[in-house]
């Protein structure tokens, strides 16, 4: 073999071998245990970032490890290709989104292949391929027929300049993220999927999956199952009733006002005779309508002049319009208890509304409400016949009274809302519905599918071009086609299943889906904990109920990898803005502990400020180009650093010196193998003929195999597995025995290193395995098995303490009994010196660890 480690030649040769031999093509085999490993597929931006590299390296290491366990492994890759960024790029660069997207896919595929990931590229697809989304359209028509889809008026974020609907995350401080215009709330008809029909099952089945508890908790909170009371407040001088839902009926006697949404019929009716209220309702239509935005916005309201009648006391309380109440959530009306709800307290304080406590504090006294609401449970006060009851008893008693009066009922509610799947955008899958001349709404038939998105279009900022293309929407005889497209979460909600049968042009899925699903390990960022992962679970249950899949859940195990973070450097400008400089352009002075002390921009030699360690991002200019690292060090070095620098769930701090260290390690391993091959031919290993040094190295080899097997297979702590191999490499480097048995032990140790590292640095290990004389490639090798006999020690070292202080170390036979160990410990010279003239009171032997002698 070449004595020099030349990563690019080595990696090119390995990748050529894998491609030529279709090494990663997955074929269903009912006689073998399968393992489906999937990393969340990327948006094709055109350039991989280090977050991608980390995610996909973790998946690749697990996939290759499971293959070495003898499993039939599927690891596919595709592209989450629809969405806003392509439209924005099209507007900016004046190119069709489709052309931009497919060019980016080609560029990113090259980058992924350069990293040597073991993907079955035969199954690749992009979600903008008509052969993919045609089945989504087909399935949607089936959901319409089953009554799981409906269309209703819904409030959206409307950008009056761009003339388009914005997602909540595209509204920044009440303004459109691109136009900067004040966003309006506007009602338009939208399509919804009935995810709420599955709320109970989505909640219960979280117990079936091996996911991080944090993610399960986030989903439970998002689904938000609660038990409360739905009750009615009559409107004074009217036949109207206001329906409200509360989880705190125990606070009912503390209601001092009712708040309704600006879109509530009562608010609109009141505004007809009140121009000021009309202006306020219009103001409420400005700004975003996300819960996050509502939580931070200034709370505003206006009295409607109407009164609500308290259902138990008969007292009249004012009805306000409040900007924090939305028609989309619940009934569009809330009962307000300012003494015991902080938001209600702030509103009441602002508008001079009475605040009346009805729950005692922990001491049983009237709570102090001068600084805020008292939100804890406690005994009821000022609540008539219900005084003195604790929460549970009060809940039941007040609910029973309301039910008896016909004014309320106990109800289970969910925070979860049905999924709005329509977007007024161009770059998405067209919704397969048509509208008739007499107002008919009809799903398209199978022979009208697919509805292909026109690809050669000019996109500008004035909204979807589909609305301006009669060739697309005009079906003749008064029939028109829907011009909305699907939310891109639709495509990512079932892609994992399509990988099982991606080549089937006749069906959405086939029996191969039942072989591969569920996904055994799904890997991605925790930022997808709610929407994507919840929608995918819902979609899976829909597919199950249509007989398309057999399992209840899509992803059996979930691994949420941490961020890749790096140092940041900037200079502040006079206007308060900052210019950020890439770490590659900055020289950093560090103290003796490696901490940064000062930094200078190389270009001008002037100092820059250190902004601390942050997630790699364009905005902070602290990203590292993976391709530049591959070009400089090779893919294996990048992969090794990614796996060694931190456990997968934790943030990984980028370190140039760490990358250089990973590269040095690979060069060292390469040289050890080359030197070993130059040293001669080893004998067949004879475990019974080994001397102590040979046994020691062999023991280290098998301890390393045992540790790495557990670290990778069970704990997924790849960094500790790599650390164990590094220790073994150090031991091999110190072992200079070139006798036939010495070479045999060295050969076994080196082969163990290569096998354990093969999932992590596959290119180098492909070459090293071949150099070590194997006919079959390392990709087809089995994971090494630890030899229990080799790990048995002939002797063990024990610490000997006298009265708790270390006085000696003993080498004793591993099989020695307590009496023999005790005798040997008492004979040790330094022990005798410290026990001379004293009475031995007790000798405690902790097998394998220490001897403690008590003497006085």
Curated annotation (Swiss-Prot):
One of its GO terms (biological process) is leucyl-tRNA aminoacylation. One of its GO terms (cellular component) is cytosol. ATP binds at residue 618. It comes from the Bacteria. The keyword Acetylation does not apply. A motif ('HIGH' region) lies at residues 42-52. It is found in: Cytoplasm. Its EC number is 6.1.1.4. GO terms for molecular function: aminoacyl-tRNA deacylase activity; ATP binding; leucine-tRNA ligase activity. The keyword Ligase applies. NCBIfam families: leuS_bact. PANTHER family: LEUCINE--TRNA LIGASE, MITOCHONDRIAL (PTHR43740:SF2), LEUCYL-TRNA SYNTHETASE (PTHR43740). This is Leucine--tRNA ligase. The gene is leuS.
